[in-house]
Design a protein with these regions (language model features):
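Kelch-like beta-propeller repeat domains
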Residues: 1-210
Length: 210
């Protein structure tokens, strides 16, 4: 079933009832204008149809990280697109949001650091959402690009019951713009960028610890 609009650089997740959520991104070529639109479709019945939900209150963004907690949909970070000196630049975000069906959006605790394009849907395990690497914007515009040292490897853990964050070590090969696929009690992290524009053939498995 086609989305109501074209979208790139968005994020999505599947909840416990097999509802597919897609949030934010861009409907235009290049990084020119971001979206705050959110869509959901139930694939547990026939025929599935997309429904538009209230926009993300934090505003338009590209490359956020999404997750599902039971029947709820969560969105973390991403990058807003803003004009500056005749160009469009990224503003790296730390806000976090939860959508509860029938109740709407609520704001969660801000991330300890900005997080853009971390593995998504984010791993959910051990009562937590895990953000593994991604881009925090600290090296945006680094020159020369070939000497870019890579993305931060900090692993962020959002404790669902407490509503709080902690930093829990570093990923051995931090990357951005890649999926996280549940498998064998862990989450497979295939490919992704090790620095802007440079992709990796590496495949790792991330196993969250209690």
């Amino acid at each position: 079933v086609d989305l109501p609009v074209p979208l790139a650089l968005a994020a999505g997740a599947v909840d416990a009832a097999q509802n597919v959520y897609v949030a934010c991104g861009s409907s235009e070529p290049g990084e020119q204008k971001a979206s705050a639109r959110v869509f959901v479709a139930g694939f547990h019945g026939s025929p599935p149809r997309w429904k538009e939900l209230p926009e993300l209150p934090g505003g338009p963004r590209i490359l956020p990280v999404a997750a599902a907690d039971g029947g709820d949909f969560l969105v973390f970070g991403g990058a807003a697109l803003e004009p500056k000196d005749g160009k469009v630049v990224r503003r790296y975000l730390r806000d976090a949001w939860r959508y509860r069906p029938g109740k709407g959006w609520e704001r969660l605790a801000d991330l300890p650091r900005p997080c853009v394009a971390a593995p998504s849907p984010a791993p959910v395990a051990a009562g937590s959402v895990w953000l593994v690497g991604g881009d925090d914007g600290s090296l945006a515009g680094f020159q020369p690009p070939a000497a870019h040292p890579g993305f931060p490897g900090t692993v962020l853990r959002y404790h669902l019951a407490e509503g709080s964050w902690s930093e829990v070590g570093r990923a051995p090969q931090p990357r951005a713009t890649l999926p996280a696929v549940p498998w064998d009690g862990g989450f497979v992290l295939p490919s992704g960028e090790v620095r802007p524009g440079v992709r990796s053939p590496a495949v790792q498995i991330f196993r969250p610890q209690p």
